[in-house]
Amino acid sequence: MKISGASALVTGGASGLGEAVARMLAARGAFVNILDRNREAGEKLAGEIGAVSFTGDVTNEDDAKFALDIAAGVGDGLRILVNCAGIGTAGRILGREGPLPLADFERVIRVNLVGTFNMMRLAAARMADAPEREGGARGVIVNTASVAAFEGQVGQAAYAASKGGIVSLALPAARELARFGIRVNTVAPGIFLTPLLQSLPEDVQQSLAQQIPYPPRLGDPAEFADTVRYLIENEYVNGEVIRLDGAIRMQAR
């Protein structure tokens, strides 16, 4: 899918990996739309890169439809959806204070997995209405999972389950949406230098970086964005999950 001139929506696009994706798409000539719960950060970034910012929740159907409808009305229709919105609340199944509250588990699943699916299904409906491009292509969806989907650590039951669900969505979604000319791929990032990690002490950051075989450093969000670019532009990549992690395999703790 050619990025230049395409209308794109990035969820969680106001910071971290989503911000890097939004900047990449804008730099390559896309009409960028950002959907994020942080109004101030979203509007600030939108002003910098010439994007449109929407304040909303990916699990809210009305919020999602509003942003997608605006994005679908630009150019020749919605062509790109990149799902980066997510949360990472930790909690043990059975901790010192008893079992993990079910509401805590449900919240992580709802935001990460249900939110991703909600955006994907609604975006697909709009992409299917767009005119065909060369080869019958109509759109591409890139979802964000995590290496926790494969090596969830202690305290990550909810997070790992949510990201594992996103990994499992890739192939059936790609197969179902193929008849509409819509591709679906997923990136499973390792440890990246996001605002959350940047808030940690330097020695903690270095300790995390030393766990990565090569290169022995934290991932740069721009590298995540470049992987998303590849998945958007390479028309033959479909139904795939790409680990982007410097060959790290997370330990139990």
Name these PLM-found stretches.
Residues A178, R183, N238-E240:
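Short, small/polar-rich loop/turn modules that mediate ligand/substrate recognition or access, typified
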Residues G88-E106, A125, D129-G135, G155-A158, ...:
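Conserved mid-core segment of classical short-chain dehydrogenase/reductases
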Residues K2-N33:
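Canonical Rossmann dinucleotide-binding motif of NAD(H)/NADP(H)-dependent dehydrogenases/reductases
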Residues I87, G98-N118, V142, I166:
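Catalytic Tyr-X3-Lys loop
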Residues M120, S162, A170:
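Active-site helix of classical SDR
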Residues A125, A174-E176:
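Alpha-helical segment proximal to the catalytic Tyr-Lys
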Residues S146:
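Residue(s) in the substrate-gating loop at a strand-loop-helix junction
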Residues K2, D220-L244, R249:
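C-terminal substrate-recognition "lid" of short-chain dehydrogenase/reductases
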